[in-house]
Amino acid sequence: MATFTDAEIDELFETSGTVIDNIITAQGKPAETVGRSAIPQGKTKVLSAAWEKHGSIQPPASQDNPDRQDRSDKQPSTPEQTTPHDSPPATSADQPPTQATDEAVDTQLRTGASNSLLLMLDKLSNKSSNAKKGAHGRAPKRGITNVRLNSRGVNPVAETVRKDRRTKSRPPLETRAQT
């Protein structure tokens, strides 16, 4: 098994931290949606602001800067020490509205998604029940449903079939019982 010196281990941690940060902040192709958006109209500003705030918050990097570790041993931890250098220091007054906004956005997304899902399920069930009942709210008749009626209000095809059945000769009952 290979052994590493403390300097090599520190270098590996630093390199892996840099790689992880690059992966997290990498910009890929944005996801494309097909069909209607799940976000209700008028809510995009709130969601955009929440997303931008969420994207600007990064986890603390405790081993990036050795000076920072020395200071943390001497002084109690403050929000400024855990904040990355490239973003402005966060105050405790900024955090609760962000959390409340994030929770509100999550609730809106869940509620909106579940409401739209329920609405679509209702529409599908109504369509299927209407298809079963027929156009006039009653069960469909067996056979041809879209027929044209003649001037007497009778389906000419059905009338022809009835006439054929009446005029056809039937075999005797004994013969029918054998088949």
Swiss-Prot record:
Residues 45-179 are annotated as: Disordered. Residues 65-74 have a biased composition (Basic and acidic residues). Belongs to the paramyxoviruses W protein family. Residues 75-101, 108-117 have a biased composition (Polar residues). It comes from Newcastle disease virus (strain Chicken/United States/B1/48). Pfam families: Soyouz_module. InterPro entries: Soyouz_module (IPR025909). This is Protein W.
